[in-house]
Regions:
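Short Gly/Pro-enriched turn/cap motifs at secondary-structure boundaries
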Residues: 68-73, 123-127
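Active-site glycine-centered loops adjacent to acidic/histidine catalytic or metal-binding residues
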Residues: 25, 49, 71, 133, ...
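Gly/Ser/Thr-rich phosphate-binding loop
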Residues: 6-66, 78
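Conserved beta-loop-beta connector loops within the AMP-binding
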Residues: 80-100, 139-140, 203-209, 244
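Conserved ATP/PPi-binding loop(s) of AMP-dependent carboxylate-activating enzymes
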Residues: 73-76, 87-122, 160
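Glycine-centered tight turns that cap/initiate beta-strands
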Residues: 17, 41, 76, 174-177, ...
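AMP-binding/adenylate-forming catalytic core of the ANL superfamily
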Residues: 101, 106, 119, 134-223, ...
């Protein structure tokens, strides 16, 4: 919803009754934060949680917000970021978000899936609940979302998070929505694919594809640019509005 709102002329509407804005469920690109605040004067408070837990990471009311960051761990949650061996990673390094249960389980976190011990064992092991979400932590303790572990693109030995590429593409004024996924490639294993919904009235041309590719190269890293760009009328989503990347 926020992504679509910032592409509209919000000055035509009376939004004076709105005092706070929050978001959860899917990470918002930094450009959305900037444009929404510019149009409304409101700062969006983002948070991270799952069906299996309550709000575990958040930009709580009164805290300093870093646009694009999920925030900091909520008090009482043993949030950490670990590598595939379950060891804590340093600041700035991607890893899986986990909840440590030592010395005791955290209130508000599920203990298992109903009649599914296999799924429970996959999520709960080594004294931690494994969320399956990848993020990194900055030097100020803020957590930044990268993507689901199974959404990370492995290309020529590089591990590329789709969210960073989506955020960069969303900075372009003619992009309404964007979903980044992996596409199979015989040489690189996988390559970055960007599925894009353009703002109404924008012509989907080959020149526009090249412009998008060059923009990503210039604002991230050359190996991260989408080698495949497709324009679509809409993106596949869940009932809650999340983009389904494995259907792109």
């Amino acid at each position: 919803m926020y992504r679509m709102l910032i592409k509209q002329d919000l000055s035509k509407y009376d939004l004076s009754s709105i005092h706070h804005a929050t978001t959860a469920g899917e990470a918002l690109n930094p450009e959305v934060f900037y444009q929404f605040e510019k149009a409304t004067g409101l700062r969006i408070h983002e948070g991270f949680g799952q069906t299996e837990m309550t709000l575990g990471i958040a930009n709580l009311y009164g805290a300093n917000i870093k646009p694009g960051a999920m925030g900091k761990p909520v008090p009482g949650y043993g949030i950490d970021i670990v590598d595939p061996d379950g060891k804590s990673v340093e600041d700035g390094v991607n890893g899986e978000i986990v909840i440590r249960t030592d010395p005791k389980p955290t209130c508000g976190v599920f203990l298992g899936y109903y009649r599914n011990q296999e799924a429970t064992d996959a999520a709960w092991h080594d004294g931690m609940y494994h969320t399956g979400d990848v993020a990194w932590r900055d030097e100020d303790g803020y957590y930044w979302y990268v993507g689901r572990a199974d959404d990370v693109i492995k290309s020529s030995g590089y591990r590329i998070g789709p969210f960073e590429i989506e955020s960069t593409i969303m900075e372009l004024p003619y992009v309404l929505e964007c979903g980044v996924s992996a596409a199979p490639d015989e040489v690189r294993g996988q390559v970055v694919k960007a599925s894009i919904v353009l703002v109404p009235g924008t012509e989907p041309t080959e020149e526009l594809k090249k412009e998008i590719q060059n923009y990503v190269k210039q604002h991230t890293a050359p190996y991260k640019y989408p080698r495949i760009v497709v324009f679509r009328d809409e993106l596949p989503k869940t009932i809650s509005g999340k983009i389904i990347r494995n259907k792109l």
